[in-house]
């Protein structure tokens, strides 16, 4: 959200409705950033389900923030499943860079769109419906590419990841991410995906601590 006023930032953040926040602090007690999470109940066909939204904003210089924010989101999803076990749940996000997309593919067992499998028609229709409900603005014929206020500040820093297969996949679908286009990502939050994601999160955090 570099270059936005406080009012623009608040409008972007609270457009998702009521949110839950987690604050994170640095070694000396300074505020490092925060993660947030919201839920939107929708009806798709004859089924009712819940669609999570969320993300995080952290000051430059702090490492592993994306993993921390995702861990918070998965814990919130798990709490929701315990409270409403009969309600289907998923997470829809706008990824504004290939690195953000790769964070999802690295930490979650099932993510759409995926370079190794086709997106089922029912998932495509569901994402289209939720995106319209959130008033996402499509920027081309692909319904998975929408407008975003979160534009990478310095895309050149991501060039070291250009050879990664998921980066190439993302860049092929959304080549204009430096100009404000974002790729939607849908993550089914069933029990297998939630626990698989938590396992990968713990493994990544242990790996970071051991370095």
List the model feature ranges, each with a label:
Residues 41, 59-60, 99:
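Feature marks short, surface-exposed loop/turn motifs that line or immediately flank catalytic pockets
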Residues 41-49:
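A short, polar/charged loop-to-alpha-helix boundary motif
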Residues 48-60, 73, 93-94:
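Conserved acetyl-CoA binding element of GNAT-fold acetyltransferases
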Residues 8-26, 31-32, 81-211:
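Terminal substrate-recognition subdomain of acyl/acetyltransferases
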Residues 23, 29-40, 52, 57:
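Conserved beta-strand in the GNAT
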Residues 1-7:
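Hydrophobic, proline/glycine-rich low-complexity stretches
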Residues 58, 63-79:
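Conserved acetyl-CoA-binding loop-helix of GNAT-fold acetyltransferases
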């Amino acid at each position: 959200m570099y270059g936005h006023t406080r009012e623009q930032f608040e409008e972007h953040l609270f457009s998702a409705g009521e949110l839950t926040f987690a604050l994170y602090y640095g070694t000396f007690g300074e505020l490092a950033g925060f993660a947030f999470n919201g839920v939107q109940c929708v009806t798709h066909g004859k089924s009712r389900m819940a669609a999570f939204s969320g993300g995080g904003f952290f000051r430059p210089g702090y490492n592993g923030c994306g993993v921390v924010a995702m861990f918070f989101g998965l814990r919130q999803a798990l709490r929701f499943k315990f409270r409403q076990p009969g309600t289907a749940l998923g997470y829809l996000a706008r990824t504004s860079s290939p690195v953000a997309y790769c964070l999802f593919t690295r930490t979650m067992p099932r993510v759409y769109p995926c370079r190794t499998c086709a997106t089922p028609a029912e998932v495509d229709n569901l994402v289209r419906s939720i995106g319209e409900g959130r008033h996402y603005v499509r920027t081309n014929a692909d319904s998975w590419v929408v407008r975003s206020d979160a534009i990478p500040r310095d895309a050149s820093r991501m060039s070291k990841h250009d050879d990664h297969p998921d980066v190439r996949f993302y860049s092929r679908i959304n080549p204009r991410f430096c100009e404000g286009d974002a790729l939607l990502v849908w993550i089914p939050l069933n029990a297998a995906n939630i626990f698989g994601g938590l396992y990968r999160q713990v493994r990544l955090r242990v790996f970071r601590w051991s370095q």
